[in-house]
């Protein structure tokens, strides 16, 4: 990776420490094949963002810098993502099961303090990374 800011091994170690701090089981031996494969793909996305310097683990929290692929007024914005709380789950109250995108935006809003509409304007790369973190939180 040409724009590697930190080594893959360090990024993986920080990811594992973050999972432990958040209560996320990252041992794929405890998962069925489909869950292990899904977890591994999501982990790769987070590790890649960490290696590039866009995502930084900070004492159990995450600071994510929106990439320059998102619109100008979003690129470079730093989002602090704290430890998961009950707010993640109550953010989805009242939404129908069919409103998956809206639920995910509500969870991302609860994670970052940004309004739901903020995420709709991000480039897919940034959205998918934040969505991945949200999914990890929802699996606790």
Which residues does each PLM region occupy?
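Short, surface-exposed, charged amphipathic helix/loop patches that serve as local interaction elements
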Residues: 1-140
């Amino acid at each position: 990776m040409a724009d590697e800011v930190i080594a893959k091994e360090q990024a993986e170690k920080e990811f594992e420490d973050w999972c432990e701090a958040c209560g996320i089981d990252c041992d794929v031996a405890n998962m069925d094949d489909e869950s292990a494969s899904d977890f591994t793909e999501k982990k790769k996305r987070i590790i890649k963002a960490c290696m590039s310097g866009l995502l930084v683990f900070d004492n159990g929290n995450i600071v994510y810098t929106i990439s320059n692929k998102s619109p100008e007024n979003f690129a470079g914005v730093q989002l602090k993502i704290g430890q998961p709380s009950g707010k993640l789950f109550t953010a989805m109250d009242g939404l129908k099961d069919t409103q998956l995108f809206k639920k995910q935006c509500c969870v991302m809003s609860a994670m970052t303090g940004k309004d739901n509409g903020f995420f709709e304007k991000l480039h897919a790369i940034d959205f998918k990374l934040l969505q991945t973190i949200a999914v990890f939180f929802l699996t606790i």
